[in-house]
């Protein structure tokens, strides 16, 4: 709980230093457990701060109850529950303080200074409890005033309900008058409906007369349509004969176009195959050249490594011979340092050579990849050119087909 943390904070070191009594000259009487209790529950460590400051209360100007009447009762109950909790917490705190003081009095029996401090602490805590009770009574009075205000709000709502009932009665009277007006308008509409029915019967008679006249006209039209159908059949037979002639010409032209298209596709296929063979030959040559270069570089690197190993062996032999000649320990240590230095230099040189080798290999890989990219780009460009050629030829063939279709349509119309 927050109040317990505030109580722990209130026990400042300055207050403890002021209230700490002077130590006696000799050791305290009693067993070791009693002395530990004295150290635990000594009144010098306990706080003399007023504990009423630990509980926060709302100002009198601030209202506990909200403006909405539905939630007033629940908030008042919450407020009263909070007050009960604070009272219970304060009582528990007072009992704890009593127990601490009784333990201190039992541990410090026979020392007047500690007894006086314990009495002072009791007085301070009694004062704090009385002040807290006063504040709680003030808060209860405030809550009672707010309950009265809530009752006044309830009376206001009752008056508002009465006004609404009066307005409702007035609205019901207006609705009754409107219903009477609606009945009169319904009677007028029924008279209008009878008049419309009479007019509808007259219109039906005129429609039947019109139907009889239309039947005679339709018979005349049927005879004329039969004559036109006979003429259309004769003209259609003539057009069918003309279409057969045109279809024969169209098939002959289509065969010629197919022959041209097949010849062009064969030529393009042959060109594609030749180009692929050339590119494959170029790739094989380029790979062989790159492999020969890589083999040469590796041979040179191996020769260099062999030479460096031989030089290292010769130097190590010379150094070993020199070390055998030396007898003094100081010279031996100096030679060892030189050997280590030379070994470090050689390792650095070896690492540099390895880096150079890897750099050359990476360059060769980059060149190899760039060659492949250029060949791939050239192949893509050739494929695009061939696609454009095929599209142009298809466009020409479609144009020729459209022309033939137009000719056929003209012949059919003629």
From Swiss-Prot:
Keyword Coiled coil among record annotations: yes
Parts forming coiled coils: 70-94, 121-149, 188-223, 266-414
Compositionally biased tracts (Polar residues): 1-13
Disulfide bonding pattern of the chain: none
InterPro entries the UniProt entry points to: FAM81
Spans annotated as Disordered: 1-43
Swiss-Prot/TrEMBL keywords: Coiled coil
PANTHER family tied to this protein: PROTEIN FAM81A, PROTEIN FAM81B
Family: Belongs to the FAM81 family.
Protein name in UniProt: Protein FAM81B
Organism of origin: Bos taurus
Upper classification of the organism: Eukaryota, Metazoa, Chordata, Craniata, Vertebrata
